């Protein structure tokens, strides 16, 4: 530890500390004079050759700048020396408040004539290591019943409805029907670019076209022609149409209605399966994968509750504040009326994060490139996001990269723990698991 300063503890509040430093005046002035002498050897002062100006002239010109630089370096060296010597651990926030500056021209060695500053900081404590052997979670196994398979197949039918053509001119278009039309869209009698089509098919209510356009088709019959004004919204994706009113003309050429397919054999063939048995095996596998993810989420919640209730940790105030800001943004972005104790949730998240980090360090759990790519695939590209855009974000946005790394490491540690803990085997139906999942 350096002997050029004296330290006094001002406050100590769990993880937050404050100290007052008084720097030895002779030490400081020696540093200042050394720097001024170094400058004097190389500086060019008007009227003098390089290095020939008197030290008094150099002081007059450079004292303030040199003083600022020496103060900065002295604070850095003494505070760093003190923190390292006392092994405070990981400092996550700090602040310097200069109380007084030394008077270069005074011989007074009182405290007020010295460099005095206060250093306040907050440390990240080491969380306790969790005892994995004491953790018991519910090892839920899903019981897939015939009714689950039947319900899944019914949803397959709805996703690929069986349309049959309507014969005759009496039937009027309804919501859910498929219509085949010819249309022309004009402004001042001129057809717009891309504003006409023949044999254009759309299902009413699917949102393929503007709602106002679809509403005009409701009630029309085969062979009927209709003209009407159509106003495009101000934020319409095609810029030259945004906010404009056009003249639309439509002819209904054919109408198709949904006819439920009763036999599963037809459904199986429509999806490319060779028979019903192959389709049902596929369905069981899909249901199993879906509920495996739900069970994993339920087990994570159980694990987090156990960690939160079992371990008491002092959490850093500055990290909690950052988490509060993050949670408030999540609530705002969701657009939902979420009623939670934000500060309590922030403290919980920080505590859980500290416990997981300790576990990762103790067991040398690290993340690899393939872990990151797998996470991106499961959470972004499987939902239509271009993987190249995500990778560019990783390289250009440090906050996003830190977020992804944190989530990947968290998942890896959680999966490591869940794999090792004791489990009480429990067989549950899909309805029971759904209920548990909804109550998380």
Swiss-Prot record:
| Keyword Cell division included in the entry's annotation | yes
The UniProt keywords, alphabetically, are:
Cell cycle, Cell division, Chaperone, Cytoplasm, Isomerase, Rotamase
Could you say which EC number(s) this protein's record lists? 5.2.1.8
**What is its EC class?**
isomerase
The chemistry this enzyme catalyses reads: [protein]-peptidylproline (omega=180) = [protein]-peptidylproline (omega=0)
Q: Mind listing the GO molecular function terms for this protein?
A: peptidyl-prolyl cis-trans isomerase activity
Task: Name where it's found.
Answer: Cytoplasm
Q: Which domain of life is it from?
A: Bacteria
Any one of the GO BP annotations: protein transport
Q: What does this protein do?
A: Involved in protein export. Acts as a chaperone by maintaining the newly synthesized protein in an open conformation. Functions as a peptidyl-prolyl cis-trans isomerase.
Q: What is this protein called?
A: Trigger factor
Organism lineage: Bacteria, Pseudomonadati, Pseudomonadota, Alphaproteobacteria, Rickettsiales
């Amino acid at each position: 530890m350096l002997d050029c300063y004296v330290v006094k503890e001002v406050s100590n509040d769990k993880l937050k500390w404050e100290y007052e430093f008084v720097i030895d005046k002779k030490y400081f002035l020696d540093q200042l004079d050394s720097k001024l002498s170094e400058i004097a050897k190389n500086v060019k002062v008007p009227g003098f050759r390089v290095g020939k100006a008197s030290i008094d002239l150099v002081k007059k010109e450079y004292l303030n700048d040199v003083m600022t630089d020496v103060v900065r370096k002295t604070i850095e060296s003494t505070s760093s020396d003190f923190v390292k010597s006392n092994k405070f651990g990981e400092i996550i926030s700090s602040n310097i408040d200069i109380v007084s500056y030394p008077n270069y021209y005074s011989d007074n060695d009182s405290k007020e004539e010295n460099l005095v500053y206060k250093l306040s900081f907050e440390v990240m404590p080491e969380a306790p290591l969790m005892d994995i052997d004491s953790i018991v979670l519910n090892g839920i196994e899903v019981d897939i019943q015939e009714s689950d398979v039947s319900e899944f197949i019914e949803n397959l039918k709805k996703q690929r409805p069986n349309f049959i053509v309507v014969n005759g001119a009496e039937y009027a278009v309804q919501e859910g029907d498929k219509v085949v039309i010819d249309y022309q869209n004009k402004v001042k009698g001129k057809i717009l670019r891309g504003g006409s089509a023949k044999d254009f098919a759309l299902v009413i209510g699917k949102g393929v076209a503007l709602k106002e356009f679809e509403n005009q088709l409701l009630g029309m019959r085969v062979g009927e022609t209709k003209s009407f004004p159509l106003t495009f919204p101000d934020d319409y994706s095609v810029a030259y149409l945004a906010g404009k009113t056009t003249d639309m003309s439509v002819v209904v050429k054919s109408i198709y209605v949904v006819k439920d397919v009763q036999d599963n054999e037809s459904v199986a063939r429509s999806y490319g399966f060779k028979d019903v048995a192959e389709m049902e095996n596929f369905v069981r596998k899909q249901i199993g994968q879906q509920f495996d993810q739900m069970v994993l989420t339920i087990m994570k919640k159980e694990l987090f509750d156990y960690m939160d209730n079992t371990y008491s940790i002092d959490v850093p105030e500055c990290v909690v504040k950052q988490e509060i800001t993050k949670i408030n943004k999540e609530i705002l972005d969701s657009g939902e009326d979420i009623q939670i104790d934000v500060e309590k949730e922030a403290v919980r998240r920080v505590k859980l994060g500290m416990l997981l980090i300790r576990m990762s360090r103790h067991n040398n759990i690290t993340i690899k490139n393939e872990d990151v790519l797998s996470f991106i695939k499961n959470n972004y590209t499987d939902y239509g996001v271009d993987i190249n855009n995500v990778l560019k974000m990783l390289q250009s946005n440090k906050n996003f990269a830190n977020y992804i790394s944190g989530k990947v490491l968290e998942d890896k540690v959680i999966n490591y723990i869940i794999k090792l803990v004791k489990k009480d085997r429990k067989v549950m139906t899909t309805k029971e698991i759904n209920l548990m999942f909804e109550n998380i």
